[in-house]
Amino acid sequence: MRQFIPMRRVLAVATLGALFWAAPASWAAAPPEAASCIACHGAGGMGNPAAGYPRLAGLPEQYLADQLRYFADGARNNAVMSGMAKPLSAAQVTALATYYSKLKPSGKPAPMPTGAAAAEGERLALRGDWEKGIPACIRCHGPGAVGVGENFPALVGQSAAYIEAQIKAWKDGSRSGDPLGLMHTVALRMTDAQTQAVAQWLAAQPLSPTKSASAKH
């Protein structure tokens, strides 16, 4: 007698197979816990821009470990990530952070915005708005916004949706853990229009800094 296999199971197996073949060569070295990360953050750790899931690949190891701890203890308020992070042991947190920090980021930036919003985004990222006490993004996140040290991660390679959501989270207090409360203070001074403009401009920048994206006018 021929056994009937539910279509749901067939689709599940096909999906897992596709994820396996899409995984980078380094996936063989991934800790077991990373299997739970791939659905949202992708096989290469570059996230899902359409859904607002962030890039993890190439971010500092200590930064990644800190974020998992913040999700676990509530410093970052996200129901899904809190549920993922709370059961992790210290060794598992370290293993995940180490693995994703060693992945090489890849991919193309989002399309460059146009018009007044693009000009405003560039101004905020490269020069800031000192009349409102808003420093340029590159002051802390480095030339090209590629990140500096363990506390100031790369902004390039992240989607506009994610960057905008995080600025709003700093603003409303649902995210904390920033050095000296710096991001909370900056976010409070930004309008929604400024938040959207700088997020869209940063998302359109290349992973490697260019002269225009690194200039401190």
UniProtKB/Swiss-Prot annotation:
Keyword Ribonucleoprotein attached: no
Single GO term (MF): heme binding
GO terms for cellular component: periplasmic space
PTM characteristics: Binds 2 heme c groups covalently per subunit.
Protein origin, superkingdom: Bacteria
Gene3D superfamilies: Cytochrome c-like domain (1.10.760.10)
Keyword Transmembrane helix: no
Pfam family membership, one: Cytochrome_CBB3
Protein name as it appears in the record: Thiosulfate dehydrogenase electron acceptor
Source species of the chain: Thiomonas intermedia (strain K12) (Thiobacillus intermedius)
